[in-house]
Amino acid sequence: MRSLLVAAAAISLGGLAGCKASPPGKLETKTLTFAKHHFIGNKKTKNPLPDNPDTWADGKEAFSHYCVACHGMDGQKTGVPFADHISPPIPSLASADVQSFTDGQLKWILDNGIWPSGMPGSKGTLSDDELWSIVAYMRHLPPAGSQGIPDMYTH
């Protein structure tokens, strides 16, 4: 009986070896985008920090500590080996979809994360000023590839 269970488990797992999630279709993507834009909180909340190079620099500093492992140094996945191979794929923060969120929505995402996408929430880890500065930095991302590859992926 035990060998039968082991054989059944091996066959089942072997059958899953070639399985892979397919990318979402257009309808799924549009539905999810609609839902995200209508159900993510803080839609009308404004960034209280000044929109200036000092704030962007503070945001870049915080971003470089907390965000580069998944979003790359430039926020556009440059050098992140797994970015397009997980489901859902990690978005480029310069994409029209991400940039269409309000500042308040981006702050809400940073605070709460997006389950089950792998985007963690930072509430309690980062201060409000750090989070708002990251939002400001996201509005002024450098060109793709201009910041190099995160150190963790170069060795």
Which residue stretches match the model-derived regions?
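C-terminal motif of bacterial Sec signal peptides marking the signal peptidase cleavage site
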Residues: 15-18
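Electrostatic cytochrome c docking/interface patches
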Residues: 27-62, 149, 155
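Flexible coil segments in periplasmic/lumen-exposed cytochrome c-class electron-transfer proteins
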Residues: 24, 41-42, 64, 87, ...
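Sec-dependent N-terminal signal peptides
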Residues: 6-12
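Short Fe-S-cluster ligation motifs
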Residues: 97-109
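Sequence/structural segment immediately N-terminal to covalent heme-attachment motifs in c-type
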Residues: 53-78, 83, 106
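Bacterial N-terminal signal peptides that target proteins for export
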Residues: 1-5
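Bacterial signal peptide processing site
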Residues: 20-22
